[in-house]
Amino acid sequence: MKRHEAREKALQALFQIDVGHIPPDEAIGNVTGSGEVDPFLRQLVFDVIEHRAEIDELLRSNLEKWKLERVANVDRVILRMATYEMKYVDDVPVSVSLDEAVELAKKFGDWKSGSFVNGVLSKVKAALQK
């Protein structure tokens, strides 16, 4: 599985976990069906959950005129995934994480999601580079 596809599946699984409050393994199973689970997909899902408090704090400090809880569910999950990658995944360039997040937002969010995600993550990127 390519990383782009793993990100899409991780987004779908994390969305189910966030909105449906289901266990991570069940959510991963729902999006992958039976068979082997991609290690990057598993890493994204479990590590975003593990680091959620730090990720959310970083997002809150970079949202202007928004509360994280009011951000659309899909956008919030995308922001969490990308922030996790930008902060914790050394083998993925920050620009790739940001670009992938914008593409996911365009595909799964509404018509404003791409620019919203880009704006927030650009601020997160700047904050991480300090």
From Swiss-Prot:
GO biological process, any: transcription antitermination
Cited function? Involved in transcription antitermination. Required for transcription of ribosomal RNA (rRNA) genes. Binds specifically to the boxA antiterminator sequence of the ribosomal RNA (rrn) operons.
Q: Which gene encodes it?
A: nusB
Stored InterPro entries: NusB-like_sf, NusB_fam, NusB_RsmB_TIM44
Task: Report the CDD domains cross-referenced here.
Answer: Terminator_NusB
Q: Matching Pfam families, A to Z?
A: NusB
The answer to whether the entry has keyword Ribonucleoprotein is no
Family membership, please give it.
Belongs to the NusB family.
**Keyword annotations of the record:** RNA-binding, Transcription, Transcription antitermination, Transcription regulation
Q: Which GO terms describe its molecular function?
A: RNA binding
The entry's cellular-component GO terms read: cytosol
From the Swiss-Prot or TrEMBL record, give the protein name. Transcription antitermination protein NusB
